[in-house]
């Protein structure tokens, strides 16, 4: 049975000891660079979409691979998107989240494609013909962390 406070909310023995802190721009970029799994969100024709992608940061932009006939392939045309990356610790009720807002485009530059094909971090989890590279050029990057005060 869940213990409840007088207000009817579940009791939390130490929830008040945690708070959100905004992360600086460079901290956000460092976390994006150190991780390679995120979620891309955008407004599709009929409904909002959010899908997981493996990505890599390269020269200030995020890149991911997809199949030319996938739903993500619609992002080869310019679209406004959000890339969300996080790391959560449910047991300790701590974690961080980064959101990169930007515009997408297909990658066609030979030098960029050569670098992306060589990246070990840009291997999709699912198999298939994932030959289309999508770039997200950031317009805004923000992040926050929830943790105990130090």
Residue ranges and their predicted role:
Residues 2-20, 82, 87-150:
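Charged, gly/pro-rich active-site loop segments
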Residues 13-39:
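Short, basic/aromatic recognition patches
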Residues 35-67:
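Short beta-strand segments
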């Amino acid at each position: 049975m869940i213990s409840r406070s007088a207000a009817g909310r579940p009791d939390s023995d130490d929830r008040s000891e945690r708070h959100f802190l905004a992360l600086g721009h460079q901290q956000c970029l460092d976390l994006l660079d150190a991780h390679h799994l995120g979620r891309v969100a955008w407004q599709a024709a009929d409904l909002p979409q959010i899908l997981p992608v493996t990505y890599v940061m390269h020269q200030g932009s995020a890149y991911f691979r997809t199949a030319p006939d996938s739903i993500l392939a619609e992002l080869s045309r310019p679209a406004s998107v959000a890339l969300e990356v996080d790391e959560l610790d449910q047991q300790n009720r701590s974690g961080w989240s980064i959101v990169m807002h930007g515009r997408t485009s297909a990658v066609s530059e030979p030098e960029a494609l050569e670098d992306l094909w060589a990246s070990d971090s840009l291997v999709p989890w699912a198999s298939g013909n994932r030959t289309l590279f999508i770039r997200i050029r950031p317009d805004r990057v923000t992040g926050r962390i929830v943790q105990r005060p130090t």
